[in-house]
A protein has these predicted regions:
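HhH-family (HhH-GPD) DNA N-glycosylase catalytic core used in base-excision repair
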Residues: 1-150
Length: 150
């Protein structure tokens, strides 16, 4: 894993919308919220209907309810504060991992062209750092299913 040492809490903005606190971050590379939430690695987040954002998902992770919205180059995390965002959500969503560097490294390996195809197909997906028990249960339950069926 390549840590993105350039990502700090100084890169975020805090605010409140309709009485709900949020933390907003801009410039997150290689992040597609819809792709992350729909790729089959988590099952406790659902799309928010009627959102004013390009896409928004709400759900529970580590016992905390959160709603995450994405617009062009901006992620907004509702129902959290700067401390919780720094200690939980940065790691959960892999915002501290330099996915662009990982992609460059994979694409530079001309001996494995199939990896380049995988990178292109999975653009924007992040590996969520989920609670181990939740990930295990989701894996076991989904063994007889496929992603479209789930």
């Amino acid at each position: 894993m390549v840590k993105d040492s350039s990502y700090t809490l100084a890169d975020v903005r805090v605010g409140e919308e309709d009485g709900i606190p949020f933390v907003e971050t801009e410039g997150t590379e290689d992040f597609d919220l819809r792709a992350v939430m729909e790729c089959g690695q988590c099952f406790r987040f659902t799309p928010v209907a009627g959102t004013s954002h390009r896409c928004e998902y709400s759900g529970v992770a580590y016992g905390r309810f959160i709603s995450v919205a994405e617009d062009e180059g901006t992620l907004r995390f509702y129902n959290t504060d700067i401390q919780e965002f720094g200690s939980l959500w940065i790691g959960y969503f892999g915002l501290d991992t330099d996915y662009a560097a990982i992609k460059r490294d994979i694409l530079s390996r001309s001996d494995r062209p199939v990896l380049g195809e995988a990178v292109a197909a999975g653009g924007g997906i992040r590996i969520l750092r989920q609670d181990a028990w939740e990930a295990l249960c989701s894996f076991i339950i989904s063994q007889n299913n496929n992603i479209p069926r789930i």
